[in-house]
Amino acid sequence: MYGGDDYGNNAEYYDEYAHTGDPQLDMEYERNYYASRMPENVKYFLINFCQAIKEGTLYDIQNMYENTFPQISDHHFDKSAWPDEQEVGPIVDNDKVFLILYKELYYRHIHARIPGGPKLDQRINSFFNYCDFFNLIISSQNPVMLELPDIWLWELVDEFVYQFQNFAQYRARLTDKSQDEIQQLCVNHSNVWSILCILNVLHSLVDISNIKKQLEAISQGADPQTVAGDFGKLSFYKMLGYFSLVGLLRVHSLLGDYYQAIKVLEPIEIHKKSAYSHIPACQISTSYYVGFAYMMMRRYADAIRTFSDILLYIQRTKQLYSTRSYQNDQINKQAEQMYHLLAICLVLHPQCIDESIQQVLREKNYHDAMFKMQCGDLDVFKSFFVFACPRFVSPCPPAADAPMEDYVKDPMEHQLMVFMDEVRQQKDLPTTRSYLKLYTTLPLAKLASFIDPNASDDDVSKLLIRLLCFKHKMRNLVWSKGPSGLEGAFKSGSELDFYIDDDMIHIADTKVSHRYGDFFVRKILKFNDLNRKLKKITI
């Protein structure tokens, strides 16, 4: 596997004295043999990495994971795989735990760097390696004493869900596969990367860590350690449980089950900063999928708030992730997607947002596209959605006897159809709103003539349907408080309201002017409270 060479067929590597019959000597021979073919800095990195994981020195593990491993990858393995398990095993005394963790990085590197992506056997082996890891930590009677940095735990869960998504798309593309590959996918390995396996693993991590009970205890001001259990008391299990909740959010979003996507996060107060949200990539990913789910549920006010808050966070914390180029690229792409989704939501549900976000929308020329959407250009809606939506997957793979077609786009086209049906119902509302904002009273017939100069009596009756649609679409469920993101109260999102008496429309501007005095009073009180606390500190 390593380097694409078949070493067994090369006579120059044959050594008749390789095996002596003494296990100790044979192991020493293998260690020296593989080490001699490996760059010295790679060999020493693997030895030190294994030692750091054995000893649980978090600082060293994090430094090697975040800095040394990417640097060696760039220098030695930019377009090729790292050494495989057979080469690494003898160097690290075949340490079982380290080899599982190493293979997680090994297959992740193949997915990210190898041109053409991983082969089928590599995808399958990666799945079974994840199974080995999760069985190790979940099936144990007692907690496994393993220390890994939170960033690795997050990226491990995130990569687990990504490889499921990637495999589902690979499996749905039948046009580039032979009959033998289809046989392997549909018969021999039908359970590999199955949705049931993914959900089972993530829910098991949530359950074993008692993370939901811990989050509920925190929200009630209680000590989470009292409900954490033997496993949940350890940071390793606790953070895996938290990240698994976000993984479940992503999985349900990819399947198009938006209600369940929000439901699974119920212990997490989505709109409040959490003590567990110190990993920027996790916080950004959470907000992206929550905001998208809200948008698809027609809860535009909540979607706008979610996108605005996280985009402000990204603006203010760029320096936290700018040192890791691949993470920077990923976050920048997700931010660009959220600006597209925010533009869609603002067209469908106009409201005020932070001026710095407005400035970005102006600088990146989103306003031109937003104007076209306001004028009913469905193609712009479609292109924005296709660019910004997740890459949906189907929970069921194509059958073994299915026609040899490409089924990858089917889930996305279904979600696009659902979204565009909603847009078509609303595409005329901006025009209606623009006329209503000009008047306090307006006859129905006059409004009908504004919309269509050749309006007939039938058009006036159709106008009533349009006005009813306006009322309905502008009234949305909006979250106000509580741990459940599904809760809320119905509120009108429009800056105007109206009622119809006979043939006359009575319009009221409900826009509330900003009360800056309250804002400054709150800030002054907060500053005074902070000042009192500082004076009490003894140095």
Curated annotation (Swiss-Prot):
Record protein name field: Eukaryotic translation initiation factor 3 subunit L
Location in or out of the cell: Cytoplasm
Primary residence: cytoplasm
PCI domain residues: 306-514
Organism placement in taxonomy: Eukaryota, Metazoa, Ecdysozoa, Arthropoda, Hexapoda
One function term, GO molecular function aspect: translation initiation factor activity
Residues in coiled coil: none
Keyword Iron-sulfur set for record: no
Pfam families, A to Z: Paf67 (PF10255)
